[in-house]
């Protein structure tokens, strides 16, 4: 039975409502926490600029940085390394842009515009003669002047634009990235409205300045002003990254190559993708990566040669090594000598202990006998020393010196003693001599032991000094590991005395006495400098083979076979220049420059582009049409003259033939202006004479 409260609601209903409210609150808190966590993680992810996916660093690393250093001569430079300077020549890009823009400009001309230019010229300078040779010369002069005017105006405008916006090292940096890492980080530059207006003003001013006296060239450039502005804008809108904050990496999971500059993603052009066949490591397929190991080997040999040249200048050098086996042998000898039983110090100590323990005369005699017997058993005559304790046992000395007693009744005769005190003096003298001898031997043994310990101490002291030098050297190498390459490179540029000092500090030599515990390992009695010529020739051949086979550069030689120059080929333009033009500058509509034109000057390239364009064809068409029209007019003017084979008024049977017309060969038509200096009737024909074909009066 439920208990009702004063507000007429049961306690169970109240608890249910509170439980629902609590659960709703908990759900709201969890949902808010989830949203906050998602937002925080996304915010932190954006702030870092990199997600949690594992990456493999490509640049900068020790390997890729060494690629760039050795590419520009900081490591292992040789003669063949100049091949790279041919490839990164910025004039190639400028000539490519010049040819492509000129070809596009000249192809945009119309035949109507060329015809109008001809009509204007014909109206100002009409042709009144009917001679075909004079007409041809007239047309050649007009076409040559038109050609020169257009080429001069176009060349002046494009030269100013290219040297203003293409006079940087972006193309060289692009080539450096291609041959080292194979990846080119690109930075898109945002153009401000003021910069765009300034660029447009510069282009218009360049066109106006170059075509003030060339109206047709001015009309042509004004009609293609959008193309000129596009070229100038694209040249300034893209930069090859050249900063220490550049980072290039590859994501492991998505296998994407990315680049960053100061934490922001930038565009990346892939020229040669690294191989990812090894875990957490990439293999580069660029030319410099192929030459890297050989270049480092050659550079190490050059540094070794320089150090040998600086250090090996003393008359004699000796390299010594420790003879540890001799030290061990000495230790063993000392131990054996220490363990000998005939040690003088032990004998004296033993004798003193025995004497102190003796309580009677017999004990003292036994101690003396034992002491003397241990030291010099072969020198002591026991019978003379102790007659009563001879080897035959105790006996009685009879009259005449006979000894009665001993084994088997042995009777011996002894020489008569010199006096009653002779045995006692012999024992005292012998004992005194033996004690002095023991003391001398003890002193000598201590001196020898001190000398041996001193020698051993010197040996270990030298060994400790060597170990300390090694530790100091290793510690200095570890501290200078980052600046080791720069320090070694300084040896090539420092003065000789300073370089010698640095080399001696890096590899010090000190005089060392060759003691008993050292042996000579090697010696130098003259200066030794290793040669690098063979390895340099080999490395030069590697550079040339790698670049010639990769980019197919072309070698120009003289008639004697000597090398004259190394230039781009058509394949090189397609392999290196066109990708930069299409993928980076976005100017793929421009025609590629032929390899024969890359050796020409700017003026010759403009002339070659004119010859390959529709402009030249339209001018030839106008000239051919005018020649045909003049021939038609000549035939119409000669209509009253009888044709060939008809009788004239001169009488029957007489034929008046028209003068044979001289035919112009194709070679003479191609030479054109070379026929100006011709002769007629024995004298030069001046086209500017009065009543001439050009209408000058």
From Swiss-Prot:
Name recorded for this polypeptide: Portal protein
Region (Disordered): 633-697
Basic and acidic residues biased stretches: 664-689
Subunit structure comment from the entry: Homododecamerizes. Interacts with terminase subunits TRM1 and TRM3.
Summary of the function given for this chain in its UniProt record: Forms a portal in the viral capsid through which viral DNA is translocated during DNA packaging. Assembles as a dodecamer at a single fivefold axe of the T=16 icosahedric capsid. Binds to the molecular motor that translocates the viral DNA, termed terminase.
Localisation: Virion; Host nucleus
Family per similarity comment: Belongs to the herpesviridae portal protein family.
